[in-house]
């Protein structure tokens, strides 16, 4: 994660690349915090957050691939793809706001191609809260499906009911 470059320096022979004034200005610029959401980040903290986001997206890509290999419920796969798409969008917003270069090659290390949902229509099937809480909501859906059977409907219907139809949700929960 270090972005330093080292060169041999021989006192009396070598010339410095940067003046003390330039280095002081650069240090001041890099230590200036920027806001994203409800948190402030210095350049170093922003780069750490960027790496954390990339790691989370690689994990989500792997989860989608494993669900596909395991022939999971298509709605569950779609929900996790939508979560991945949301992570990508958040990553782009974060990098723009922090003036960082997006390093998507760090996300695509698995060389497995496209994982995100294909359209906004697919993303719109699930409420935003459900996309954020994908794993918990899928587990909850499976428990309800075990008890209530087909009455609970599909994962898409479950999400719509839980987050958008409070009357029906009160009845079943």
Walk through the language-model features, giving the residues of each.
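Activation/maturation switch segments at domain boundaries
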Residues: 1-173
